[in-house]
Amino acid sequence: MMKGRIISALLSIFMMLMSNTLRADNVISQFHILGGELSNSAATSVSDIEEVLPRMKVLGLNTVLVPVYWEFLESVEGQMDFTLFDRTIDVARQQGLKIVPLWFGAWKNSMSCYAPAWFKRDVKRFPRAVTAEGKPLEIASCFSNNVLQADLKAFSALMQHIAEKDPQREVIIMMQIENEIGMLESARDHSPMAEKAYKQPVPQALLKALGIKQPGSWAEVFGTDDYADEKFMAWHYACYVEHLAQAARRIHNMPLYVNAAMNSRGRKPGEYPSAGPLAHLADIWKAGAPSIDILAPDIYDIGFKSWVSQYAMPLRPQDGGKVKNRLFIPESRCCENSGVRALYAFGEHQALGFSPFAIDQASPKETESVTQAYNLLSQIFNAKPQNTWGLLFDQEDRERIIDDEGVVMTCRHYFTLPWDPRATDGSTWPEGGAMLIRLGKYDYLLAGSGVVIDFKTRIEKQQEQQKKLGEDGFAEAGSETSNFKFQTSNFNGSRLGLLSVDEVTIDHQGQMQFLRRHNGDQSHQGRHARISVGDWKLLHIQLYEYK
């Protein structure tokens, strides 16, 4: 009898652990974060929380990224106050929102500005990082065990409180550990504890992860320039974070991520936050912090497509068949282009989520595109799409050609069409973008704004003659040669035509609901499917083949 009870208890524990793991994995694999991150000071009072979260619901978000401030959580050492955090959970639950807490602990944007006053004042117990010139910084040293233990204690208390307040993860779905970790002014910390660590051999675990066989000191293995110093610092930041991540796993298992400020504009380590969870340091971070699920980019610079491609890391055999890094964008500039960028990230890279920063402070003109895109994405996800592409165009990057098993789709910015005066009035083109979904053979969905697509067979595309169109949609000028007649008279093969282009919605069951047919002038007499700049639509496109 006793033996049976013991076995039953062990099975219950096992199932609970498996359930926790599955729930954590399901957030990563199934839920799509249509998010927004609050500005840094938006959650410092109960009244602010009660005002801002309902506004986020109205904007169409399903998830809000909310700071949790160490200085408020533990303003008196050893005494935790969860008043702000509890109200955040309560209001989010009322609004039907998910929350991703941002642990503003030892570091926020490299600095230790959110550490409590008792921590800041006790420099002897909680030492600072030091530049190569010997200047102390307002950056707690990750080489100090006192710093780690103080941070870990508060973070663990937060995780324990989440486990008690939201045990089924109905509201809290993921956790960000610290914020934009990195060393500034120097590529690495030069404090006495850091110098001692620098003289030690490179850990075998890191050498193995990087495929380096020859052991040695950090200088011997990597050299002595700023980028070598950055590797040293990245390993130690990652190991620090791993302590917090392991605690989170033990207390209340959920997806965990760290975010990175980009190494942009030709800056060197220390000019940008050195050693953060950047793409070129991903192997070091994955080795030092294996409990972290995602390295996430904060994107404010130009070149959105290039940045996201670096963090949407593909399957590799050495990763045991696991995705090396699922794309999640916790911060992006909130602007009129945010909506099409979200569609691109989800369509091209099957992103976990997208989140414009300081969305609570953005103007209606800046948030409108987010609301429109999230409305389309919510409908698309109801249909559980499998085969998708992302489109994103601007004035320079105007066209993309996709060959989908013989269906050649030429996708362009809407302003490549000649009849919209905004295309040629000299103003900067807004970005156009969309998510393109294959439902089946000759069957597609297009969701977005500011794009146009035509569909051809491969042979059709090969023999296509480029002609500049006039504002009436016909050739701008006549041809004096018979070249056009020669090509068409010798055409041999099938062509694709538009069977129908319907504007639709998708309901909660994933079923399409017809709104209107796009034909005639709206499809250029069957030549293309298009969504104009400023419009946000979901089009169901069906093709047919003819000879």
Where are these regions (language model features)?
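The substrate-binding groove and active-site-proximal loops of carbohydrate-active enzymes
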Residues: 33-45, 67-85, 132-153, 161, ...
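Catalytic-core region of carbohydrate-active enzymes that cleave or remodel glycosidic bonds
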Residues: 97, 243-253, 279-387
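Short, basic, low-complexity termini and linkers enriched in Ser/Thr/Gly/Pro
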Residues: 7-24, 481-490
